[in-house]
Curated annotation (Swiss-Prot):
Start and end residues of each EXPERA domain: 60-185, 216-350
PANTHER family the record matches: TRANSMEMBRANE 6 SUPERFAMILY MEMBER 1 (PTHR14568:SF10), TRANSMEMBRANE SUPERFAMILY 6 MEMBER 1/2 (PTHR14568)
One Pfam family named in its UniProt record: EBP
Principal place of residence: membrane
Name recorded for this polypeptide: Transmembrane 6 superfamily member 1
Phylogenetic lineage: Eukaryota, Metazoa, Chordata, Craniata, Vertebrata
Topology of the protein relative to the lipid bilayer: Multi-pass membrane protein
Species, as recorded: Pongo abelii
Keyword Transmembrane helix: yes
GO-annotated cellular components: lysosomal membrane
Length: 370
């Protein structure tokens, strides 16, 4: 493959601009099932055009076509975000009103911006890597964590939240977004991991140091313990814990946790049942040397937390959130400090695992034992 294939995918994604404009005007004249059929046809044509772009030398990695289609939908989501902010008009108005009204929520607004910016950049990078036959395993795992986190919160939130009674046929367009990332995740994970050619002496010296002689790791351990407590606390709030402390926190710090849209409640439960076990596992990995799985699960978790905290912070402060559920003005500094710190911690841990992996590399003796 040549670099022109990656450029072609970029241009193909930009075709979403005229396509959404025409689609919006057609959607206003047809029923919901017709809209779903046309949308599915458009996505199929995008995949077909991506295949035409690389007809002479098709990629070895079939995920090229997945990223091409998802890149197109990322531009669509960016258009939705811009239209919701009143920057543009007439592109997705009817679809937002009749197709997926839950995208009009503050949370829906934020995930549109995340998909249209962060995910879009990841797709372009991964497409370029495939075109140049380079590995993209690191950014691929980060993307897997990010998109699966958005699906795990957004799809159930649409069903159990206040828009649950307004589920339209367009909801079925979420099926590819649910299935394809899982398939992609397995393919990316099974790609060859990076080989670290560190001398045995360097690895042994790094692994011989206990936690007290690794100040950065010690700081991470302390932060992970605090983050675990924070996750459990907000999870209890999501489960309607009657404790006075939970009531006060919800009332004066994060009233958004009680938003009837249900996204924040599901997000806190995901943190409780997904992040807490991860934090415990990461604590083990930072104490016991040779845990070669640490970089991979850390990347996946870092991607998920980046998406989740961006959406949660943005929705908590967004004007589309009812005033009674927005973060009070006097609580904003503490709210931002806690939530930004919680979102940054997994990124620091991922940086630690990827760029200084000596502590997590298995020695040859350990590999022989296995």
């Amino acid at each position: 493959m040549s670099a022109s294939a990656a450029t072609g995918v970029f241009v193909l994604s930009l075709s979403a601009i005229p396509v959404t404009y025409v689609f919006n005007h057609l959607a206003a004249q047809h029923d919901s099932w017709t809209i779903v059929g046309v949308a599915a046809l458009i996505l199929f044509l995008v995949a077909l055009l991506a295949r035409v772009l690389v007809k002479r030398k098709p990629p070895r990695d079939p995920l090229f076509y997945v990223y091409a289609v998802f890149g197109f939908t990322s531009v669509v989501n960016l258009i939705i975000g811009l239209e919701q902010d009143g920057i543009i008009d007439g592109f997705m108005t009817h679809y937002l009103r009749e197709g997926e009204p839950y995208l009009n929520t503050a949370y829906g607004h934020m995930i549109c911006y995340w998909d249209g910016s962060a995910h879009y950049l990841m797709y372009l990078v991964m497409v370029a890597a495939i075109a140049w036959e380079e590995t993209y395993r690191t950014i691929g795992l980060y993307w897997v964590g990010s998109i699966i986190m958005s699906v795990v919160v957004f799809v159930p939130g649409n069903i159990v939240g206040k828009y649950g009674t307004r589920i339209c046929p367009a909801f079925f367009l979420s099926i590819p977004y649910t299935c394809l990332p899982v398939w992609a995740g397995f393919r990316i994970y099974n790609q060859p991991s990076e080989n670290y050619n560190y001398p045995s002496k360097v690895i042994q010296e790094a692994q011989a140091k206990d936690l007290l002689r690794r100040p950065f790791d010690l700081m991470l351990v302390v932060c992970l313990l605090l983050a675990t407590g924070f996750c459990l606390f907000r999870g209890l709030i999501a489960l309607d814990c009657p404790s006075e402390l939970c009531r006060l926190y919800t009332q004066f710090q994060e009233p958004y946790l009680k938003d009837p849209a249900a996204y924040p409640k599901i997000q806190m439960l995901v943190y409780m049942f997904y992040s807490v076990p991860y934090f415990v596992t990461a604590l083990y990995g930072l104490v016991v040397p040779g845990c070669s799985w640490m970089p991979d699960i850390t990347l996946i978790h870092a991607g998920g937390l980046a998406q989740a905290q961006f959406s949660h912070i943005g929705a908590s402060l967004h004007a589309r959130t009812a005033y009674v559920y927005r973060v009070p003005e006097e609580a904003k500094i503490l709210f931002l400090a806690l939530n930004i710190a919680y979102g940054v911690l997994p990124q620091l841990l991922a940086y630690r695992c990827i760029y200084k992996p000596e502590f997590f590399i298995k020695t040859k003796a350990e590999e022989k034992v296995e």
